[in-house]
């Protein structure tokens, strides 16, 4: 308290501003951390939902097979044609592998189709499709994190995918979102928050200056 008394009125007002801005900064950091977590969770949930929706296409063609309308081979081929053409958020796609795991259909890397993909690993040594197959066998569905190149690029980037087993055909359908896209969106929000915070700081500093002058001048 004695320390505060030794401060001038102007210094006290600036101290209030500094404390207020520090608290605002701490609150902003907490909010940004929550935004980051929510953004990641939102992307993961969206991926889960679109995979579940795409799995409905497999169910539809399997229904045609069980009804005798199509042979299994014809039903599977038509289902693959439809799923291979599906896109969302511009370039995001679906692939299908089986439980061995062999690639059944990959729309952006056709050279994988029909091949054993159990040995494919990301730069960290993670056996991508083997882990997906194991997850599908044990839990039926789930999320897998790994690194994989974007379409048209050879550089692996962080990706989180959702995979789901379609048991009648022994297929695993999956789709994923690239984390760098999410990070770019997050940092866009960070910069927006920084500019807003800077604007608030400038306004508050101007107000403190005006208030300090209005108090000090009559006392001089």
Model-derived regions, located:
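Short N-terminal helix-loop-first-beta-strand/juxtamembrane motif that initiates sensory/input modules
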Residues: 84-103, 140-143
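Short, hydrophobic beta-strand elements of compact beta-sandwich sensory domains
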Residues: 158-183
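Extracytoplasmic/periplasmic sensor domains and loops in membrane signaling proteins
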Residues: 73-80, 110-151
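Juxtamembrane membrane-water interface segments immediately C-terminal to a transmembrane helix
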Residues: 16, 30-77, 192
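Extreme N-terminal signal-anchor transmembrane helix of membrane signaling/transducer proteins, especially
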Residues: 3-34, 193-211
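Amphipathic coiled-coil signal-relay and dimerization helices
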Residues: 28, 102-108, 156
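Membrane-interface helix-start motif
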Residues: 179-197
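Cytoplasmic juxtamembrane amphipathic helix immediately C-terminal to a transmembrane segment
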Residues: 36, 41, 208-220
């Amino acid at each position: 308290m004695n320390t505060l008394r030794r401060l001038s009125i102007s210094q006290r007002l600036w101290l209030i501003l500094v404390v207020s801005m520090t608290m605002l900064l701490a609150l902003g950091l907490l909010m940004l951390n929550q935004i980051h977590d929510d953004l990641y969770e939102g992307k993961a949930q969206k991926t889960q939902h679109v995979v579940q929706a795409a799995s409905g296409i497999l169910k539809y063609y399997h229904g045609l097979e069980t009804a005798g309308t199509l042979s299994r081979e014809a039903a599977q081929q038509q289902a693959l044609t439809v799923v291979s053409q599906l896109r969302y958020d511009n370039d995001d796609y679906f692939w299908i592998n089986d439980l061995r795991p062999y690639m059944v259909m990959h729309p952006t890397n056709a050279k994988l189709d029909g091949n054993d993909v159990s040995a494919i690993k990301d730069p960290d040594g993670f056996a991508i499709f083997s882990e997906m197959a194991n997850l599908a066998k044990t839990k039926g569905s789930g999320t897998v994190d790994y690194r994989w190149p974007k379409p048209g690029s050879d550089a692996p980037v962080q990706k989180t995918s959702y995979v789901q087993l379609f048991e009648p055909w022994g297929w695993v359908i999956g789709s994923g979102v690239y984390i760098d896209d999410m990070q770019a969106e997050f940092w866009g929000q960070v910069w927006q928050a920084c500019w807003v915070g800077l604007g608030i700081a400038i306004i508050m500093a101007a107000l403190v200056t005006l208030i300090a002058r209005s108090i000090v001048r009559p006392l001089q």
